[in-house]
């Protein structure tokens, strides 16, 4: 990869562009260098931002080559206050790879997740869970998928590669049982939490952490 300036991306909310510019200025002021894939040196690999479409809640995660940032508390608090962030996290990724996220994430400020709804399903998400970036389009696709499925009250619905389970859970009122399969542990736990929040016992909606090809 080559790092190039992109101060005004048209595909994301303007606050994300403004935060990226401000964060880069703070990092430079603190002498914190960006990560270089070729040398494996430098601290900051990515700025990872999310926003709940309906809730408006905002998440920021620094993906770092190391355990954290110099002056971490001050930098994170400044950005949280200036951009009304719901939560700020640090993800540790020391591997020589172009994979974005590492395994270890810790919360610096806030609850560690943001909340939103998707097709009427309440969700909580951190950084590891897959989330459609265009929520209105996703909700239209969910509705079309439900129409094509033509579910009946006694049907068994298998949701493969289910992520947080939003597709299956949005269709659960129209079938007898739902089983979701997903390889990301955090997403599976999130799906189970949502199902419990909706009052669905495991015998009606359950989720398994495994490879869908082996399910």
Residue ranges and their predicted role:
Residues 71-82, 86-215:
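Rossmann-like S-adenosyl-L-methionine
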């Amino acid at each position: 990869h080559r790092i190039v300036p992109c101060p005004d991306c048209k595909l994301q909310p303007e606050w994300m562009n403004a935060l990226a510019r401000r964060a880069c200025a703070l990092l430079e002021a603190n002498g914190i260098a960006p990560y270089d894939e070729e040398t494996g040196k430098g601290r900051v690999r990515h700025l990872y931002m999310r926003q709940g479409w309906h809730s408006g809640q905002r998440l920021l995660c620094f993906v770092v080559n190391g355990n954290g940032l110099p002056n971490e508390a001050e930098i994170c608090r400044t950005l949280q206050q200036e951009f009304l962030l719901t939560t700020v996290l640090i993800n540790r990724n020391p591997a020589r790879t172009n994979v974005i996220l590492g395994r270890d994430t810790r919360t610096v400020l806030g609850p560690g997740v943001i909340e939103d709804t998707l097709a009427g399903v309440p969700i909580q998400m951190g950084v590891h869970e897959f989330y459609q970036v265009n929520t209105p389009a996703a909700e239209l696709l969910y509705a079309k998928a439900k129409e094509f499925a033509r579910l009946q009250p006694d049907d068994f619905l298998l949701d493969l590669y289910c992520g947080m389970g939003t597709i299956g859970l949005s269709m659960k009122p129209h079938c007898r049982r739902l089983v979701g399969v997903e390889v990301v542990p955090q997403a599976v736990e999130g799906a189970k939490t949502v199902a419990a929040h909706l009052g669905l016992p495991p015998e009606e909606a359950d989720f398994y952490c495994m490879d869908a090809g082996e399910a």
